[in-house]
């Protein structure tokens, strides 16, 4: 007999979020809701929020990794806005992407113009040539 009933005693499969199905940490459902509520388009496909969530997660991981390296270079264990600024501005692609972004409490990149550096004296150059 073919019917709707399955085997007796078999447990129903637990529901799995779209984030878990895609192997992501960021919430796909929330991104989908924000895309729908934002009036970006009349209709939003099912793959669009998954792809966008994956891109956002990748960018966040990339920035956090570089900021963590900057914090470690400064012998700190906590990432502060200064570390985010250094990480973004020292990376060519992230700097191009976030070129117009101002990071509060980020400071500026250390840079001294070559004309402002002290000139080598004649004595220092002669002494180095003799050795």
Curated annotation (Swiss-Prot):
InterPro entries linked to this entry: Histone-fold, Histone_H2A, Histone_H2A/H2B/H3, Histone_H2A_C, Histone_H2A_CS
Subcellular location: Nucleus; Chromosome
GO cellular component terms listed in the entry, alphabetical order: nucleosome; nucleus
Phosphoserine found at: 128
PTM note: Phosphorylated to form H2AS128ph (gamma-H2A) in response to DNA double-strand breaks (DSBs) generated by exogenous genotoxic agents and by stalled replication forks. Phosphorylation is dependent on the DNA damage checkpoint kinases MEC1/ATR and TEL1/ATM, spreads on either side of a detected DSB site and may mark the surrounding chromatin for recruitment of proteins required for DNA damage signaling and repair. Sumoylation on Lys-126 may lead to transcriptional repression.
Residues modified to N-acetylserine: 2
Position of sequence motif [ST]-Q motif: 128-129
Cross-linked residues, Glycyl lysine isopeptide (Lys-Gly) (interchain with G-Cter in SUMO): 126
One GO biological process term: heterochromatin formation
Pfam family, one: Histone_H2A_C
Keywords: Acetylation, Chromosome, DNA damage, DNA repair, DNA-binding, Isopeptide bond, Methylation, Nucleosome core, Nucleus, Phosphoprotein, Ubl conjugation
N5-methylglutamine: residues bearing it: 105
Annotated site residues (Not ubiquitinated) in this chain: 119
N6-acetyllysine: residues bearing it: 4, 7
Miscellaneous information on this protein: In contrast to vertebrates and insects, its C-terminus is not monoubiquitinated.
Family, per entry: Belongs to the histone H2A family.
Subunit structure: The nucleosome is a histone octamer containing two molecules each of H2A, H2B, H3 and H4 assembled in one H3-H4 heterotetramer and two H2A-H2B heterodimers. The octamer wraps approximately 147 bp of DNA.
Domain note: The [ST]-Q motif constitutes a recognition sequence for kinases from the PI3/PI4-kinase family.
Protein task: Core component of nucleosome which plays a central role in DNA double strand break (DSB) repair. Nucleosomes wrap and compact DNA into chromatin, limiting DNA accessibility to the cellular machineries which require DNA as a template. Histones thereby play a central role in transcription regulation, DNA repair, DNA replication and chromosomal stability. DNA accessibility is regulated via a complex set of post-translational modifications of histones, also called histone code, and nucleosome remodeling.
UniProt-recorded name of the protein: Histone H2A.1
Provenance organism: Eremothecium gossypii (strain ATCC 10895 / CBS 109.51 / FGSC 9923 / NRRL Y-1056)
């Amino acid at each position: 007999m073919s019917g709707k009933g399955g085997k007796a005693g078999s447990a129903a499969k637990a529901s799995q979020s779209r984030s878990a199905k895609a192997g992501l940490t960021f919430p796909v459902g929330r991104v989908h809701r924000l895309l729908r509520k934002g009036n970006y388009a009349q209709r939003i496909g099912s793959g669009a929020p998954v792809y966008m969530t994956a891109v956002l997660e990748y960018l966040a991981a990339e920035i956090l990794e570089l900021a963590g390296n900057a914090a470690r270079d400064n012998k700190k264990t906590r990432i502060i806005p200064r570390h985010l600024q250094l990480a973004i501005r020292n990376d060519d692609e992230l700097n191009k992407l976030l070129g117009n972004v101002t990071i509060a409490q980020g400071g500026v990149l250390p840079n001294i113009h070559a004309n402002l550096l002290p000139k080598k004296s004649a004595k220092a150059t002669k002494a180095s040539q003799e050795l």
